[in-house]
Amino acid sequence: MQFFVRPGEEMKWWQAWKETRMAWHRALGFGDDRYRFHDHEKLAHYANAATDIEYNFPFGFKEVEGIHSRTDFDLGNHQKFSGRKIQYFDPETGESYVPYVVETSIGVDRMFLQVMSAAYTEEQLEGGDSRVVLRLPAALAPVKVAVLPLVKKDGMPEVAQKIVDLLKYDYNVVYDEKDSVGKRYRRQDAVCLLYTSDAADDMQCVD
């Protein structure tokens, strides 16, 4: 993302974007203490400020997003090599200028690695077995509700489907009637399900 600013105000906006982007990362729910800023001591020739937001992976702190004040390098070079005037008339100051750029850059691959490394858990069970559980924060869970009829008879699948119909416009809902209910709960644990509904418990609540 490139944010265009008035020359001379780029440091104010760079600081504002640092705070905004750090707040976004912390809102994911993995713990505020797992993030830090790493300001660059050596800057690229076009930059006058740069920092990375780093996340504490199992293998140490690594960058997940960069925030840079790129001065007028980008638009200035477009203007220079295109031969066309690229300036903004500022109605507040009555001046025309080449805007400075504050840029934030985040990669989907690193974010995916961050989410999976934080959420992936292997629980040890009795007998030496283990099971995979994905402990995603609620905001990131892809499925919010699973509806699981206890048996495939006595009208339970129909009741379960009514529950799905009531919820599907407000939540990401899955319906599962395959295998035992315990195995179905287990499958939902593996993808970080937030809520389940047993149709047997809800038959008295649904007409």
Describe every region a protein language model picked out.
Residues 2-198, 207:
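NTP/phosphate- and nucleic-acid-binding module
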